[in-house]
Amino acid sequence: MIKAAVSVPPAGVIEGYRQVAPVIEREGDAATVDTTGVYFQQLNDAIRRLVADGVTTVRVTGANGQRYIGAGLRVPGVRIEVHGTAGNDTAMFMDGAEVEVFGNAQDGVGNTMSSGRVIVHGDAGDVLGYGMRGGRVFVQGDVGYRVGIHMKAYEKHVPVVVCGGKARDFFGEYMAGGVLVLLGVNTHFPEQPLVGGFTGAGMHGGVMYVRGTVEPWQCGAEVGITEACEEDLSVLRPLVEEYAEAFGEDAEEIMDGPFVRIAPVSHRPYAKLYASM
């Protein structure tokens, strides 16, 4: 086993973190990075250098909100485990790698992600999946506001976000493509509705599936609510199975619940505001 430390600027304090090098233990193509008290720049520098040096599994311990973990990684086959709380923009711009968080994740997970997979064994914050263009994100618990905003798809690149708990306002806002799933089976807020208000506001592409009941008053004027049909369930099943496998849950029990489909009624909901009809 090799212990090493990345080079860092002179010792100092930034936002409550010491500018210290993370302690790295490496064995073959796997490495553990202790990031206790380490600033996000030092952590991400260490991850990038390890991946460039042939490491395929990076285990991050002591995470306490350091942001940009896995951001910009374009190396398929690389896996990052985060033990603790993953900070803002985890997996941002990621293209092919996998990030698994054993804890909660803050805002912006999967921001503009192109491919790869993110698994969060906990809750996630706001703007989850912002502008995603591909890849898959699975969150075991509750999620925040504006989840799936501006998700988009192109040809075979179809982003997927599956949330096991409940969501707040503006779920699926301005969606242009992709698949957004809300299961409501793992939540800290059993007394609250599955989704907040303005669900699908401005949505003009893609589809949302919610396990349970969604009322018209909860949705934007740009979407319609229908019962999920057999074709919808055939799309849902493999996603629910992947979710269940990731978190050790029962896919059949989840699929037994009623699902509704939320989809746009127009692909140009605001055309009359900026173009002649």
What is each PLM-predicted segment?
Residues M1-M277:
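Long, distal/terminal scaffolding or interaction modules
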